[in-house]
């Protein structure tokens, strides 16, 4: 009996040492517990789909949404915990990473209700759609906490593969297939460019893959001022540029937006930018800390091109989704200002604040587009003429979201841009902020042009699509309109709650 007790104690002590050595969640506070919730949700989806019939479809939506909400709650419960590095340095947990994870989870939580009625009307496979959304979300969450080059490469590939599959989900649609091919080819090329830049960092640092160790390695090898660092910086910037889709890396964006299912576009338009912004802040701020002047210059050029080209080309668009694609290119130019400012002068805090508002504004706009598309079957901007006469609630919701995207006071977009531009001005980015102000005013023009069409009540200018417009059933008000109402409220009245939002964003800085 004594031997058994000693043997049990030896096994227990050995297990504890083994777990502690590898920083497994059981003994270190469960760093990846939010990610494990999503993995458990994925397993449940597969089990239910393989063992049940069509009557359990609502359970699939319920499990997906519940797992996302529970992951958000898990992140909030461990807020302000000490930063931790786990899995032999591959994964880092801190408030700054977690706030990006919360934003990604929030995007996915709002996007699932947007897809319910759309999937039913188009007869798309439901389980696979939800699996791809949750897996892409999981990849984005791992990307936010990635602390070495291998994880930084694998995590966005997990997100990208699911994005490719989602963009081509309507296999019988020629435009969707074309968009998927362009997305896949350019995504593969950008991943190759990104990993080539990583190989330069790996070699110049003396074989290091952890971000902080790369900095130490560059100092030890005295390669931080070598031409190789500039080459690595250029390749990595181009690779990340595809994920952020600033000009001139934006060619895939309009085609993918136009050809993909609208709920997929809504999902990709926000989650990809949040995940890529998290990646950009870590890559540029840590390994390239000693080359800040060089990457500042590169990002300033990208921001200028994005703001100018995105807003100018958006004026000429006739498709609502293509217009939002070019609008998003301009919006990423504003977000890049926060990345350039960085930790000083509240640059990251202003970027996070504006990104939160951008999620609500953009998803609210897409919710309105999905509703209008399901009821009329069109995406043409001119076909929105006279919508206010048929559905005042939808027209007003779309108008508020568009005005908020344009940055008109007193809506959320105005306060977000004001804070972001002010931080850029304090950091000395005077020319960049002036261009941002001019292009913001320019964007108001094409937003107001759409709003003018919405409010047009003359019968001779109302299109047949609006003339035959039909209101949806009560069920849609529990799904698409639920997300729309939440996003519209978040896009219009957060001005009174700006201080708490900014305080949370500042508290997340590392």
Curated annotation (Swiss-Prot):
Organism phylogeny: Eukaryota, Viridiplantae, Streptophyta, Embryophyta, Tracheophyta
One of the record's GO cellular component terms: chloroplast thylakoid membrane
Membrane topology, as annotated: Multi-pass membrane protein
Protein name: NAD(P)H-quinone oxidoreductase subunit 2, chloroplastic
GO biological processes: ATP synthesis coupled electron transport; photosynthesis, light reaction
Record's function text: NDH shuttles electrons from NAD(P)H:plastoquinone, via FMN and iron-sulfur (Fe-S) centers, to quinones in the photosynthetic chain and possibly in a chloroplast respiratory chain. The immediate electron acceptor for the enzyme in this species is believed to be plastoquinone. Couples the redox reaction to proton translocation, and thus conserves the redox energy in a proton gradient.
Alphabetical list of NCBIfam families matching this protein: NDH_I_N, PRK02504.1
Subunit structure: NDH is composed of at least 16 different subunits, 5 of which are encoded in the nucleus.
Residue ranges crossing the lipid bilayer per the database entry: 26-46, 57-77, 99-119, 124-144, 149-169, 184-204, 227-247, 295-315, 323-343, 354-374, 395-415, 418-438, 484-504
An annotated Gene Ontology molecular function: NADH dehydrogenase (ubiquinone) activity
Family: Belongs to the complex I subunit 2 family.
Subcellular location: Plastid, Chloroplast thylakoid membrane
Domain of life: Eukaryota
PANTHER family in UniProt: NADH DEHYDROGENASE
This enzyme's EC code(s): 7.1.1.-
Primary localization class, coarse: plastid
Entry-linked InterPro entries: NADH-Q_OxRdtase_suN/2 (IPR010096), ND/Mrp_TM (IPR001750), Ndh2_N (IPR045693)
Reactions the enzyme catalyzes: a plastoquinone + NADH + (n+1) H(+)(in) = a plastoquinol + NAD(+) + n H(+)(out); a plastoquinone + NADPH + (n+1) H(+)(in) = a plastoquinol + NADP(+) + n H(+)(out)
UniProtKB keywords: Chloroplast, Membrane, NAD, NADP, Plastid, Plastoquinone, Quinone, Thylakoid, Translocase, Transmembrane, Transmembrane helix, Transport
Pfam annotation, one family: Proton_antipo_M
């Amino acid at each position: 009996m004594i031997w058994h007790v000693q043997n049990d104690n030896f096994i227990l002590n050995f297990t504890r040492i083994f777990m502690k050595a590898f920083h497994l969640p059981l003994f270190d506070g469960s760093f990846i517990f939010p990610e494990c919730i999503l993995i458990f949700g994925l397993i449940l989806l597969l089990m239910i789909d393989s063992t049940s019939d069509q009557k359990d479809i609502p359970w699939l939506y319920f499990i997906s949404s519940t797992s996302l909400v529970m992951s958000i709650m898990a992140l909030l419960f461990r807020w302000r915990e000490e930063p931790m590095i786990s899995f032999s340095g591959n994964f880092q947990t801190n408030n700054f990473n977690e706030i990006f994870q919360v934003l990604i989870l929030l995007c996915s939580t709002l996007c699932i209700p947007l897809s319910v009625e759309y999937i039913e009307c188009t007869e798309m496979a439901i389980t696979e759609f939800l699996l791809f959304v949750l897996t892409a979300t999981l990849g984005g969450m791992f990307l936010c906490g990635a602390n070495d080059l291998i994880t930084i490469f694998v995590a966005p590939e997990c997100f990208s593969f699911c994005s490719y599959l989602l963009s081509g989900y309507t296999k019988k649609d020629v435009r969707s297939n074309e968009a998927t091919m362009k997305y896949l080819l350019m995504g593969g090329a950008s991943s190759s460019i990104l990993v080539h830049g990583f190989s330069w960092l790996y070699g110049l640092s003396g074989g290091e893959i952890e971000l902080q160790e790369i900095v130490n390695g560059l100092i030890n090898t005295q390669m931080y001022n070598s031409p190789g660092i500039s080459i690595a910086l250029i390749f990595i910037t181009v690779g990340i540029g595809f994920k952020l889709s600033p000009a001139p890396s934006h060619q895939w964006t309009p085609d993918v937006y136009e050809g993909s299912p609208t709920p997929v576009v809504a999902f990709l338009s926000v989650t990809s930018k949040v995940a890529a912004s998290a990646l950009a802040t870590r890559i540029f701020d840590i390994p390239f800390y000693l080359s800040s002047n060089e990457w500042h210059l590169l990002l300033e050029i990208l921001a200028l091109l994005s703001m100018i080209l995105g807003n100018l080309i958006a004026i000429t668009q006739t498709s609502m989704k293509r217009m939002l694609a070019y609008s998003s290119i301009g919006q990423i130019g504003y977000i890049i200002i926060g990345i350039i400012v960085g930790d000083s002068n509240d640059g990251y805090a202003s970027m996070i604040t504006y990104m939160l508002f951008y999620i609500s504004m953009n998803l609210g706009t897409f919710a309105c587009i999905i509703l209008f598309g399901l009821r009329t079957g069109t995406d043409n901007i001119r076909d929105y003429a006279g919508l206010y006469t048929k559905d005042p609630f939808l027209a007003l919701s779309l108008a508020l979201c568009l005005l908020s995207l344009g940055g008109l006071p007193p809506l959320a977009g105005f306060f977000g841009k004001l804070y972001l531009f002010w931080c850029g001005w304090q950091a000395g980015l005077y020319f960049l902020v002036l261009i941002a102000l001019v292009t913001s005013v320019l964007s108001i023009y094409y937003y107001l042009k759409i709003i003018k069409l919405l409010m047009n009540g003359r019968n001779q200018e109302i299109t047949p699509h609006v003339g035959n417009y039909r209101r949806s059933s009560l069920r849609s008000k529990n799904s698409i309109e639920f997300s729309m109402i939440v996003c519209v409220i978040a896009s219009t009245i957060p001005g009174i709650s700006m201080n708490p939002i900014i305080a949370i964003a500042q508290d997340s800085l590392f």
